Amino acid sequence: MKNFFVSALAAVMTLNVSAAKKPTARLQFEALKGVAGSVEMPRGRVNYTAFTKLYYVTNVEDTTYQYMNVFVPEGASQQSPIILKTNVGGYMPSAAGNPSVGDITGMALQRGYVVAIVGSRGRTSYVTKGKKKIYNGKAPAAILDLKAAIRYLRHFDKQMPGDAEKIITDGTSAGGAMSALMGAAGNNPAYEKYLKAMGAADERDDVFASICYCPITDLSHADMAYEWLYGNTDSRKANDTAHRQVSQELAALFPAYINSLGLKKKDGTLLTANNYLGYIKEELIRSAQIAKDAGAEIPDSIGFTFNSDAGTFAPVNGGMPDLGKLPRDMAKNLKRDGMPGGMGKRVGEYITDLDMTKYLNYVANKTPLKTAPAFDALGVSGNEASGENDEFGDVNNTPANFTDYSAGKNGTTVSAKVKEEEYLLNPMEQIGHEGITVAPHWYIRHGSIDRDTAFPVALNLATKLENTGKDVNFLLAWNRPHSGDYALNELFNWIAEITK
């Protein structure tokens, strides 16, 4: 008994010393500490119970960000799906917030879903030790925090309302990349050493579905994809000689990459550099046709061609049947392919072609293109470094190159540390690999006028997921810039379908 008390006292003293050195938080959930709240929605007030500042690791390094807030609407149960929202943008730190009428969270509560808004560290977050700033939010901190939050929800699944086997992640831009990672990197052992050191729960971290708006991902190949797509636009041709050369050199690297992926279209056609632009064109035409059928005016001045009887504008709804009245399998094919199998095109109703040169110039004129290279700057000091260079920086806040091309131009090589971080931040490198659990359901959107990253980034992600048997709802959303959480009624109809 004496030894027991001595050991207990020693443990308490150790705990107090540790607490003095670094903030700590117990991994706990107290069901009786919920606070009543509400959010005003267009259709009325939604009441909820809020559980705030739920620290999802025991070794908390940053008390500003490493926790989440969970909101349980009236009527929710243990079976209610959980919407996990990340507000990460630009790979910056993201605080756990409150539900909003302006994004997925408000409507999720209105529809009876539990909402978890997760805070996470980012590339500019730091803690102070003595007089020194330690930047502890560089890659892969954000995805580690988010994975730890998933483990927390699963750890307390029986105590908390909501079904931890029905977690649906949502994010936009870099947050879209985080959502893609949560969906693509479930239970990957490569993260385990980090999560263990953080004091994350010893649980699975796979999820049920991922919603990814304009994901800024596959950073290792994003520069080459960007220049391959936009390198022949008038904007790029107007650049100085040095930047034109960079653009051309990067564009020349993309064919080998796309050929190496072995991606296939739905009909089994192998995608290569020779037919990939046509693949993008098909997706843009599909998006424009959906918009036209809903009543949007699609001008021929941006590159579209309509059959001769249609003139400039096709008829509203284009003679297309109501999707809600079709069998589910036919409606699904219609959404993806533009018309159900066996239904031929009717005269005057369909977009027939798209001049990609004209269309890409249109996109570049809507919003100026990024300077080449778009992501991994040739100079990585001071203002020359990109946000992505900063993301791969070190604890001293020194940015780093992360591609062989830009590192080579700077006379250096990509370090082993950065290569590991690249892998941990890239869903494309994890999908389809043994020992990793990929979410079965995906909702991926990239705007048809979004030039923040090139169309192939999101399209490759969607195609690779489809090729590995996942359920993917993908669209180059018509006339959408770089943005997220739009067309929420459509999104929640999809959520209702996959969770019923």
Please describe what each predicted stretch is:
Residues 155-232, 422:
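Primarily recognizes the serine-hydrolase "nucleophile elbow" in alpha/beta-hydrolase
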Residues 85-143, 185, 480:
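Cap/lid segment of the alpha/beta-hydrolase catalytic domain
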Residues 68, 78-91:
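Short beta-strand element of the alpha/beta-hydrolase
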Residues 222-226, 263-338, 343, 443-450, ...:
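C-terminal catalytic histidine-bearing segment of alpha/beta-hydrolase fold enzymes
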Residues 135-159:
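Alpha/beta-hydrolase active-site loop
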Residues 52, 185-196, 201-204, 276, ...:
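Mobile cap/lid helix-loop segments that gate and shape the active-site cleft of serine hydrolases
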Residues 23-78, 412-424, 433, 464:
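N-terminal cap/lid segment of alpha/beta-hydrolase-fold proteins
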Residues 10-18:
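Hydrophobic h-region of N-terminal signal peptides that target proteins for export
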